[in-house]
Curated annotation (Swiss-Prot):
Region spans: Framework-3: 71-106
Gene name as annotated: IGLV3-10
A Pfam match: V-set
Residues covered by region (Framework-2): 51-67
Protein's GO biological process: adaptive immune response; immune response
Annotated protein name in UniProt: Immunoglobulin lambda variable 3-10
Signal peptide: 1-19
Start and end residues of each stretch annotated as Complementarity-determining-1: 42-50
Domain of life: Eukaryota
Keyword set, alphabetical order: Adaptive immunity, Cell membrane, Disulfide bond, Immunity, Immunoglobulin, Immunoglobulin domain, Membrane, Secreted, Signal
Disulfide bonds: C41-C106
């Protein structure tokens, strides 16, 4: 699992090794309220696995915002979307809001739940 905090205006870098492969999220980028934030996650296993994205606000449990690459759970605002192509998955927040400030975790698994 890799993570990136969306700090309006900062996204931070992290690389995490999981089950013999790595998921990598990019260096920091600036995001102002109302702008579009794109957080990428790359890994050699992603073409064969689904990407899941979690949002974790300070002091709170993680919340699933995108599953199976691009599906949005009920209750998650439409400004959150996901896509995946080749070895890269992307979480897009269109018109980022102040309340979107959080850590964002990229996680991958196949349909059977294998990491």
């Amino acid at each position: 699992m890799a993570w990136t905090p969306l700090l309006l205006p900062l996204l931070t870098f992290c690389t995490v090794s999981e089950a013999s492969y790595e998921l990598t999220q990019p260096p920091s980028v600036s995001v102002s309220p109302g702008q579009t934030a794109r957080i990428t996650c790359s890994g050699d296993a992603l073409p064969k696995k689904y990407a899941y994205w979690y949002q974790q606000k300070s002091g709170q449990a993680p919340v699933l915002v995108i599953y199976e690459d691009s599906k949005r759970p009920s209750g998650i605002p439409e400004r959150f979307s996901g896509s995946s192509s080749g070895t890269m998955a992307t979480l897009t927040i269109s018109g980022a809001q102040v309340e979107d400030e959080a850590d964002y975790y990229c996680y991958s698994t196949d349909s059977s739940g294998n990491h």
